[in-house]
C-alpha cells in the first residue's frame, strides 16, 4: 500500500511539473508541439499506473497476494459496485462458496483497491471483538453522519470516544428498561393491526390486500419516537414537525439516495451538482430537525420531575456527559438506526410466514394457547407482554430464523486503522475489511447442509433434556462465538439497541399473526431485496389477509 501511495505521489508530482512547464512556454509553435509531447507522456503514465495497480502491485508486491483471490468482475472497478447492489450479501455468499479459503478472501474494488472478506468465526471474532478498535468505520460513513447530524455520534466515533459514549448510553438500553417498554411496543403493535384491518381494500378479484411494509414503517417510527422521547412526545406539536423534517431528508427519492451516496464517497462540492436543490433542502431540513429536537428536550428539562423520566432522551440528558449538540445528534442517530432496520426485519419475518403457512399456523396456535384474545383487541395495556412473548419458543424461533436468512444490514465494513494482522496475515493500513452477516448466517460451516433453508425448528429443542418445545438461542449453530448469527453484529460495536429491536419485532409479529391469516397477494411474485443502508423487499410486501376469529 505504501508503494502505491509513493507511485501516485510521483504521478501527481509529474503532472504538476508538466502543467508548470506548459504555462511557461511562450511561442505558439513550441506550445503545440510540447502539448502533444506532454499528452503522450501523460497517456503513457496513466497506462503504466493502470498496469501497476491492476497487475504489478496485486500480483508481485501486495502482502495479501498469497490469499485466495476472487477473479475481477470488471477491469479497474472490480467488485466496487457490489457495495451498492440491492442484494449486497448474495455476491459475497457466492464468493465464499466458490473460492476455497481459510477465513480470508481477497477481492478488488474501485481502482483495484484491495479488500478482504471475512468468512471464518476466528477472523470475524478477531475484527469485531478481540481487536475491534484496530478496525474503524469508513471515512464516508463518518462524513455522512457528521453532515446530517452536525456532531459526532456513537455509531461514527472511535476508540476512547466510542467506549465512553457507549458507557454513558448503555443504562437505558439494558434488559430491565426494555421490559418496561414492552407494553408500549404491544400497544403500538395492536394499533398497527387496527390500521391494517381498516386499510385492506378489495382488489379486482374481491381479495383483501394491503402493503404491510408501509404500516410497519409507520408503527416502528411511532414506537421508536415513544421509546426515545417518552410519553410527552405523543401530544407534542414537535412530533409532527420532527416526522415531517425526517421524511424530507430520508424519504427515499432518487435525489436523496444520490445525495447520501455522494456524501459518503465524494467531496462535498459535488453535492451542489445534483439537480433539484437537494443539497440546500437537506441542509435546511437537517438544521430544522436538530432545532426541533433541541426545543422539545429543553421543554422536557424545564418540567418539574423530569429527572425521574425513564425515556432514553432524559436518561442520556441526566448523565451530564453529552453536550446539547451531542445529545441531539445521538438521539437522531438512534432514530435513523432504529426505524428502517426494525421495520425491515419485521417485514422479512412476515414474508417468510406468508410463504410458509405451516409455521404461521404453529405460531398462531402457540399464541392462542398462551394469550387471551382480548389482549389483541380491547385490552392491550393489561397484557404482560415481556414475560409472555419472550417465553414463546415458536414465536422466537420464527423471528430468529427470519433474521438469520434476511439480516436488515447484509454487509458491514471496516478500515484497518494501521498496519496489523488478521489470522496472522499482514494487513496494511487503509485496507477495507468486509463482514457479511448474510454470508455468516447462511454458512454451511456454521449451520450445516440446511443453511440456506428456512427451518425455524433449528431454534427449537434442548439436546440435554431432549425436549423439542424448548427455545434454543444458539439455533444449533456449530460455533460458540456468536459469529454464525450476526443480524446486529457482535462485540463492542454491536448495535446498542438490538434487544429493543428484537422486542419490537416479536410484538409486531405476534399481533399480526394473532389478528390475521395472511398469504402473498401474488403468489408468483419474486421477492427482491433492495436498499442502500437497509435490505428490505423492493416494492413493499403486499399480503392477502383474512381476520382470525375470536377464541
UniProtKB/Swiss-Prot annotation:
EC nos: 1.-.-.-
Membrane-crossing segments per the record: 37-57
Residues at which heme binds: 495
Induction (UniProt): Expression is induced during the early biotrophic stage of development. Expression is positively regulated by the ABA cluster-specific transcription regulator abl7.
Lipid bilayer topology: Single-pass membrane protein
Locations listed in the record: Membrane
Enzyme category, top tier: oxidoreductase
GO cellular component, as recorded: membrane
Taxonomic superkingdom: Eukaryota
Broad class of the protein's primary localization: membrane
Cofactor(s) needed: heme
GO molecular function terms listed in the Swiss-Prot or TrEMBL record: heme binding; iron ion binding; monooxygenase activity; oxidoreductase activity, acting on paired donors, with incorporation or reduction of molecular oxygen
Family label: Belongs to the cytochrome P450 family.
Protein name: Cytochrome P450 monooxygenase abl5
Gene: abl5
Amino acid at each position: 500500500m505504501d508503494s502505491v501511495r509513493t507511485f501516485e505521489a510521483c504521478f501527481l508530482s509529474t503532472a504538476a511539473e508538466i502543467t508548470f512547464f506548459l504555462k511557461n512556454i511562450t511561442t505558439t509553435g513550441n506550445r503545440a508541439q510540447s502539448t502533444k509531447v506532454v499528452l503522450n507522456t501523460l497517456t503513457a503514465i496513466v497506462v503504466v499506473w493502470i498496469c501497476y495497480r491492476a497487475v504489478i502491485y496485486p500480483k508481485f508486491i501486495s502482502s495479501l497476494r498469497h490469499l485466495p483471490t476472487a477473479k475481477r468482475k470488471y477491469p479497474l472497478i472490480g467488485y466496487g459496485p457490489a457495495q451498492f447492489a440491492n442484494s449486497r450479501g448474495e455476491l459475497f455468499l457466492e464468493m465464499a462458496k466458490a473460492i476455497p479459503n481459510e477465513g480470508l478472501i481477497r477481492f478488488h474494488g474501485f481502482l483495484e483497491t484491495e479488500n478482504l472478506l471475512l468468512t471464518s468465526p476466528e477472523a470475524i471474532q478477531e475484527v469485531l471483538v478481540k481487536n475491534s478498535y484496530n478496525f474503524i468505520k469508513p471515512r464516508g460513513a463518518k462524513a455522512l453522519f457528521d453532515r446530517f447530524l452536525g456532531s459526532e455520534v456513537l455509531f461514527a466515533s472511535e476508540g476512547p470516544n466510542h467506549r465512553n459514549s457507549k458507557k454513558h448510553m448503555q443504562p437505558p438500553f439494558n434488559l430491565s428498561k426494555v421490559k418496561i417498554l414492552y407494553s408500549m411496543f404491544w400497544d403500538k403493535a395492536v394499533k398497527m393491526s387496527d390500521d391494517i384491518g381498516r386499510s385492506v381494500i378489495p382488489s379486482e378479484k374481491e381479495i383483501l390486500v394491503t402493503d404491510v411494509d408501509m404500516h410497519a414503517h409507520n408503527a416502528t417510527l411511532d414506537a421508536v419516537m415513544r421509546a426515545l422521547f417518552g410519553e410527552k412526545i405523543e401530544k407534542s406539536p414537535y412530533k409532527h414537525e420532527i416526522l415531517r423534517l425526517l421524511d424530507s431528508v430520508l424519504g427515499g427519492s432518487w435525489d436523496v439516495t444520490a445525495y447520501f451516496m455522494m456524501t459518503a464517497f465524494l467531496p462535498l462540492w459535488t453535492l451542489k451538482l445534483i439537480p433539484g436543490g437537494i443539497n440546500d433542502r437537506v441542509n435546511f431540513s437537517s438544521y430544522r430537525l436538530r432545532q426541533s429536537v433541541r426545543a422539545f428536550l429543553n421543554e422536557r428539562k424545564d418540567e418539574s420531575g423530569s429527572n425521574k423520566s425513564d425515556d432514553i432522551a432524559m436518561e442520556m440528558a441526566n448523565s451530564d456527559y453529552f453536550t446539547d449538540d451531542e445529545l441531539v445528534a445521538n438521539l437522531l442517530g438512534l432514530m435513523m438506526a432504529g426505524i428502517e432496520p426494525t421495520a425491515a426485519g419485521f417485514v422479512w419475518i412476515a414474508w417468510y410466514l406468508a410463504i410458509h403457512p405451516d409455521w404461521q399456523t404453529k405460531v398462531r396456535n402457540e399464541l392462542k394457547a398462551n394469550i387471551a384474545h382480548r389482549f389483541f383487541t380491547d385490552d392491550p395495556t393489561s397484557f404482560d407482554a415481556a414475560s409472555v412473548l419472550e417465553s414463546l419458543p415458536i414465536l422466537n424461533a420464527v423471528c430468529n430464523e427470519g433474521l438469520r436468512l434476511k439480516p436488515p444490514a447484509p454487509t458491514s465494513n471496516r478500515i484497518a486503522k494501521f498496519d496489523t494482522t488478521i489470522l496472522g496475515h499482514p494487513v496494511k493500513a487503509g485496507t477495507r475489511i468486509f463482514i457479511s452477516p448474510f454470508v455468516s448466517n447462511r454458512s454451511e460451516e456454521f449451520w450445516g447442509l440446511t443453511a440456506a433453508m428456512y427451518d425455524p425448528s433449528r431454534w427449537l429443542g434442548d439436546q440435554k433434556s431432549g425436549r423439542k418445545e424448548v427455545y434454543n438461542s444458539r439455533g444449533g449453530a456449530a460455533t460458540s462465538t456468536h459469529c454464525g448469527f450476526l443480524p446486529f453484529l457482535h462485540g463492542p460495536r454491536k448495535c446498542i439497541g438490538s434487544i429493543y429491536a428484537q422486542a419490537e419485532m416479536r410484538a409486531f409479529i405476534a399481533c399480526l399473526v394473532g389478528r390475521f391469516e395472511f398469504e402473498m397477494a401474488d403468489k408468483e411474485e419474486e421477492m427482491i431485496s433492495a436498499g442502500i443502508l437497509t435490505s428490505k423487499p423492493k416494492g413493499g410486501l403486499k399480503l392477502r389477509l383474512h381476520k382470525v376469529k375470536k377464541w
